[in-house]
Amino acid sequence: MSQSGEENLQGSWVELHFSNGNGSSVPASVSIYNGDMEKILLDAQHESGRSSSKSSHCDSPPRSQTPQDTNRAEIDSHSFGEKNSTLSEEDYIERRREVESILKKNSDWIWDWSSRPENIPPKEFLFKHPKRTATLSMRNTSVMKKGGIFSADFLKVFLPSLLLSHLLAIGLGIYIGRRLTTSTSTF
């Protein structure tokens, strides 16, 4: 794009024109509101910007005048004088009521959203893992530290528990084996 083309844009708005077959072009941004809703929203944004700009964390540069804004201002100034020629008085009032009802319905969630507290995490937001003081290992027990597997303290606990677990396993095996042999012989 040439330098003069970029200077003509003066912002991020681009106006597109479509031809309707007979050679005349129609702007793509034709709305039934003719920018009234946008003007109301911009006014509300400017009013809220005055009160909240001091506490705003993100200061942005002021918005520059775009070609679409200047065209819209010219159209709006002509539309007030030509209001009776394009629309009847009743249609104009009905359209204004529709716009106001839409703005009332949509403004509640905007107000709730904009007045909520900021989600700012604390400055010292570090995860601290708990230190393991005692691991579940036989090597770290006091019995193993004293004399190992063949110490008297370890053998006093380990051998009776080993013997008891084997006796329970043998007894359970014999009991289940007898139940199975008696149940198969009755069939």
Swiss-Prot record:
Modified residues (Phosphoserine): S48, S60, S77, S79, S85, S88
GO molecular function: endoplasmic reticulum-autophagosome adaptor activity; GTPase binding; identical protein binding; mitochondrion autophagosome adaptor activity; protein homodimerization activity
Membrane topology field: Single-pass membrane protein
Membrane spanning stretches: 157-177
UniProt keyword list: Apoptosis, Membrane, Mitochondrion, Mitochondrion outer membrane, Phosphoprotein, Transmembrane, Transmembrane helix
Composition bias, Basic and acidic residues: 71-81
Keyword Transmembrane applies: yes
GO CC annotations, alphabetized: cytoplasm; dendrite; endoplasmic reticulum membrane; mitochondrial membrane; mitochondrial outer membrane; mitochondrion; nuclear envelope; nucleoplasm
Subcellular location: Mitochondrion; Mitochondrion outer membrane
Motif (BH3): 93-118
Major place of residence: mitochondrion
Annotated stretches, region: Disordered: 42-86
Family note: Belongs to the NIP3 family.
Function: Apoptosis-inducing protein that can overcome BCL2 suppression. May play a role in repartitioning calcium between the two major intracellular calcium stores in association with BCL2. Involved in mitochondrial quality control via its interaction with SPATA18/MIEAP: in response to mitochondrial damage, participates in mitochondrial protein catabolic process (also named MALM) leading to the degradation of damaged proteins inside mitochondria.
Assembly, per entry: Homodimer. Binds to BCL2. Interacts with BNIP3L and ACAA2. Interacts (via BH3 domain) with SPATA18 (via coiled-coil domains). Interacts with BOK; promotes BOK oligomerization. Interacts with PPTC7; this interaction promotes BNIP3 degradation.
Name under which the protein is recorded: BCL2/adenovirus E1B 19 kDa protein-interacting protein 3
Organism listed in the record: Mus musculus (Mouse)
Gene field: Bnip3
